[in-house]
Amino acid sequence: MADYYETLGVERGASDDEIKKAYRKLSRKYHPDIAGPEFEDKFKEVNNAYDVLSNPDKRRMYDSGVDPNNPNAGAGGFSGAGFGDMSDVFSTFFGSAFGGGSQGPVPRTQPGRDALASASIDLKTAVFGGTAHVKINTFSLCQECGGSGAQGGAQPVTCPDCHGQGFMQKVVRTMLGQMMTSAPCERCEGHGTIIQNPCPSCMGHGRVRTTRTVGVTVPAGINDNARLRLANQGEVGEGGGAAGDLYIDIRIKADKQFTRDGDDLHCWIQVPMSWAVLGHDLSIDTFDGEKTVSIPAGCQTEDTVTLKGLGVTNIRNKDERGNLIAHVNVLIPTKLNETERGLIEQFAASHDSGATHVSQASRPQAGQKKGFFSKLKDALS
């Protein structure tokens, strides 16, 4: 007999809340839509365990040594006498009387499955947090019947054929003589109850498939591909059962101006040659509004200027933020009039002293960036 307590990872004396909490955790962990199709059997085991332990009557039966989902798998019957394999053979021919089927009514109310969706946000929302809206298509509670499945909200009535047992017994003639077999009640489909007037909206299922928009609170500092959980926002179960959870995978869209590296943001600014030589204060747009960047005199291409505290919010400490790092690109003029060229040549002559030879030691090494004046000479030569 399967150990349902071990399957859910709880003690035999676990409370209903502990069992439900364990089930929620494991159903999310092994849900085929999340963990992958290879976990489908494990997911079914978890559901079977919860089906028994969440039902007081079934749990009492199980604790007494009889599995409600397989009554003949306990100490009695053929398996108790060492004929487990024969039990399977008999069940093939004669039904659940020989250890094959599940006896007892099947609950109409079943827990809902978890759902998975994705949301795209811009980089600014990732920096400061915000709200994303996701459109999902899932089973929702039928508003017409409130989940009962019956028209007008009426409750199901006891099946007159099986008298609420969910299965029917009959005597059949076999090579071994007359045998008693049992099978799910055809009239109530094993539920033990029938819905006399099914709800026209959900056709007696207590739920309908709908498309709805869900608001998702995005925490500041969230990373790309992070997954958020919204409890009880997944699919409503059969018979209006409790909804599963909704998982949202976050995708951060590329930004035209900034890139992200951990908690730091990076941007690129182009400055005229004169600003790089003399230094200059300029304004740039940031996620915090317009800010001033001070370009130091003698600034080179690929130099950086750091604006502290203007980066991404730290997801673990909302009072901390990374930095905004501005990368400088000095614009070298490619077209000069005679006056401008003359001034540049005078400037170059005063610094280069007419030198035409560069010693080997002063050449840039591999991976070393050229200085501003070297680039200027390259542009004018």
Curated annotation (Swiss-Prot):
Where are CXXCXGXG motif repeat segments found? 142-149, 159-166, 185-192, 199-206
Q: Which UniProt keywords apply?
A: Chaperone, Cytoplasm, DNA replication, Metal-binding, Repeat, Stress response, Zinc, Zinc-finger
> Polar residues bias located where?
356-365
Molecular-function annotations in GO:
ATP binding; heat shock protein binding; unfolded protein binding; zinc ion binding
Q: Which GO terms describe its biological process?
A: chaperone cofactor-dependent protein refolding; DNA replication; protein refolding; response to heat
Please give the GO cellular component terms listed in this UniProt entry: cytoplasm
Question: Mainly resides where?
Answer: cytoplasm
Enumerate the cofactors the protein uses: Zn(2+)
- Protein name (database record): Chaperone protein DnaJ
Which spans of this chain does the record mark as coiled coil? none
J domain residues are 3-66
| Annotated positions binding Zn(2+) 2 | C159, C162, C185, C188
Sequence segments annotated as region (Disordered): 355-381
Species whose genome carries this gene = Bifidobacterium longum (strain NCC 2705)
State whether it acts alone or in a complex, and with which partners, per the record: Homodimer.
Tell me which positions the record assigns to the signal sequence: none
PANTHER family per the record?
A: CHAPERONE PROTEIN DNAJ, DNAJ HOMOLOG 1, MITOCHONDRIAL-RELATED
Which protein family is named in the record?
Belongs to the DnaJ family.
Cofactor: how bound: Binds 2 Zn(2+) ions per monomer.
Name of encoding gene? dnaJ
